C-alpha cells in the first residue's frame, strides 16, 4: 500500500516491530495431542496421514486414504454446526427450500472477510469525554497494509467443519482443455483420458447430475426460451449439480459430508477404518527437518483450552483453502513474511502467493416476461373467473397439440384450481431454474442462470420470487506474477496468524476485454427472459466475491520453469511428504466453478500417496 508521511502507519511500517506470530520461535517440544476419546478402539497418537481442513477436498483425501487402510486425523479451525450430519449442507432443511431468500442470512453469517482496508472515516460527534483514537492502526479487524485499490474486497473464508460446502451452490462443471491444468505433457489425448477418469470418480463422490430439475416448470421455461433464441449458436443445459432429488419439492444438496462421513472410526458401520476429526483446532505451522526434505510434525493449538500440541505423521496434507494453505506455509518458513521484495526472493517456494487469479463476476436479476408467464398455461382450457361458481381449468392429456408435457400441465391445472387466489399459474413449490451455457472458446466465461442464495441478491418481499431469474456470469483471469497474496510480519488476524494482504488487479488486455464482452452477453441474453429487477441492474461485483481464488500455490511440472509450488501429484517441490489440495493448485485462467477440478487433483494425489506410503497395521480392539 502506498502511504504518505502524514499517515500514522507510514512511520510504524518502517520500524523493526514484528508481530508475535512473526517473532515466535518454532517450538520443538510440544506434547502430542491426546485422542478425542481414549476408549476408541485402535486409537493412538501417531497417524499415517494428517489432513488440515475438512471441506470437500480434505474429505476426498480422507475417503481415499481411510478406505485404503490408512490411519487418518483431520484438523479444522472451525466447529461442528451443521446438525447430525457433520459437515452437511445447511440448505438441506425444508425451511430454506421453501424460501431460498432466507438462506442469504446464513451465508452472510458464515463468511469472514480476508483483508479489510482501514476505514479512515472519522467519527467527530463523540462526546468529548469518550476516548478517541489518534491513529489509523488497527481497529475492527482492519488491515492498514491493504491498498484498497488493489484488494480482493469480496474475498472471504468460512471457518466451520465442512467449509464453504455447507452453503455453496453445488455447481460442479468440468473444465475443458482450455481451462484445465496439464497432467500429461505433449499428449492431449492421454491428458483427456486421465482427466475423464478423475472427473468421473469425483462426480460419483459428489453425486453430480444434470437432471434434478427436469420437472421444474420455471427451469424448462428459461431453458427452452434460451435454446430457441440461440438455436444453432449456443447450447443450453442444466448446470451440473452436486445434489440428489429426494422428492418433487426437496433436493439434498451435496457437501463435504457427501464425499466422506466425518464420524470418528472405528465405529459400528466401519469397524476396520481409522479416522478422527478434531474441530476447533488452529493449525499454526508444519515443522521441517534439518535438510528441508520432509515434514516432521504439525503444530496445532486447541482453541477451546489454548493448549498446543505437536502431531506426527508419515504424510501431511493441507486442504485449508487457497488463503489458509498459503498462510500456514508462510508461517512455517516457506515463502516469506512481509511485503514481497523482488530483490530478495524467498529460498523455499519462491512463487508461493504469486500469479494468483480470481474470476470477474457480472450479475443482474430479471423478472420473467408476461409472454413467458402466459405460456405456462397455454394448454389449459379456462372457463369462468377464479373464485366464482363454475370456474374450471382443464387440459387434454397426451394431445398432439399440447406445447407442454403432461406432468407440467397436471401441475398447472392443480395449482390453478387449488389456489384460485394466486395470479400466477406456477405452483408455489415449483423448483427453481438451474440453467447454464458452458464455457466455450467463442464465449470464454461460465454462466449460471438460476435462482439461488448468495451473500447478495436477496429479493424484496414485494416481488414474487417465482418470477425472478438470477444471472451470474464468471470470467477468467490470466495469471500474472504481479498479482499476489502476501502475509504481514507486523499485523495478525483474529486467530493470531499473519494477516493476509492482496496486491491484485484484473489484467489489462484479454482479461479485461473478455469481462466487458461477458457483461454485454449477459445483458443481451437476460433481456430475452424479461425486464431487469429494480436495484439489480447489470453490474460488475466486488473483486473476490466469486470466492474462486486460485493459483496461490500453483501446480506444474517444474518449479522454476512453470513458476509453481507443487507437482502434478500435488506434492510440494523438494518435500517427500507434504501435499497441498484445493483451488490454490490450479495455475490456469478458468471461468467455471473449480471445486470438481480441485477434487480431481486430490484423487490423483491420493493415488501417489497410496503407491509411496504404506498404511500402519490395524490392531482390532481386544
Curated annotation (Swiss-Prot):
Instruction: List GO molecular-function terms, semicolon-separated.
Output: flavin adenine dinucleotide binding; pyranose oxidase activity
Co-factor(s): FAD
EC numbers on record: 1.1.3.10
Its subcellular locations are: Periplasm
Q: Which domain of life is it from?
A: Eukaryota
Locate the active site.
548 (proton acceptor), 593
Q: Which Gene Ontology cellular component terms are annotated?
A: periplasmic space
Predominant subcellular localization, coarse grouping:
periplasm
* InterPro entries reported for this sequence: FAD/NAD-bd_sf, GMC_OxRtase_C, P2OX, P2Ox-like
Which residues are the signal sequence here?
Answer: 1-28
With respect to pH, the record says:
Optimum pH is 5.5-6.5.
Which chemical reaction does it catalyze? D-glucose + O2 = 2-dehydro-D-glucose + H2O2
**Entry similarity comment:** Belongs to the GMC oxidoreductase family.
Task: Give the protein's biological function.
Answer: Catalyzes the oxidation of various aldopyranoses and disaccharides on carbon-2 to the corresponding 2-keto sugars concomitant with the reduction of O(2) to H(2)O(2). Plays an important role in lignin degradation of wood rot fungi by supplying the essential cosubstrate H(2)O(2) for the ligninolytic peroxidases, lignin peroxidase and manganese-dependent peroxidase.
PANTHER family linked: PYRANOSE 2-OXIDASE
The entry describes its oligomerization and partners as: Homotetramer.
**Name of the protein:** Pyranose 2-oxidase
- Which gene codes for it? p2ox
